[in-house]
């Protein structure tokens, strides 16, 4: 029964009058957004909509960063959100283009690195009998730099 139900739903989907086929169809919308971005970009790349060199993507990332700075100057939260999303999308495109490791794996590595450094800072502060709240941003930045050196 389940198999028949899935066949009927698939046929309805393929024959829906308002449904337009897209080369991007089939990218699951339930997976993490970073994975979605890479899958969308990969499908577009297969059709020739891709960069020829990774440096071009870095330039695009810089362009998106500049647009984010402009949006921040305007104070328009919706525009800031849009530009921040564009920046994240462009950055994910670089990991997709390089074909070494997925952006999801790279971000996971960065998360673990951040956590390790933050925990180092916590230990250093505890050894000094301090808490984060006791420090100004300059002191915290100095601790962060020390953590990066470890």
Q: What residue spans do the PLM features occupy?
A:
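Flexible "arm" and connector segments at domain edges
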Residues: 1-84, 89-150
């Amino acid at each position: 029964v389940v198999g028949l139900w899935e066949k009927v739903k698939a046929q309805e989907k393929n024959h829906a009058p308002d449904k337009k086929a897209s080369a991007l169809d089939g990218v699951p919308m339930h997976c993490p957004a970073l994975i979605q971005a890479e899958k969308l970009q990969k499908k577009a790349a297969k059709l020739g909509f891709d960069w020829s060199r990774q440096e071009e993507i870095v330039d695009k990332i810089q362009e998106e960063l500049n647009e984010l700075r402009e949006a921040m100057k305007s104070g328009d939260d919706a525009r800031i959100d849009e530009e921040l999303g564009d920046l994240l999308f462009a950055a994910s495109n670089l990991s997709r283009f390089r074909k070494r490791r997925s952006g999801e794996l790279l971000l996971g590595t960065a998360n673990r690195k951040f956590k390790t450094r933050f925990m180092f800072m916590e230990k250093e502060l505890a050894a000094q009998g301090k808490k984060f709240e006791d420090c100004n941003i300059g002191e915290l930045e100095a601790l962060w730099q020390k953590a990066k050196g470890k």
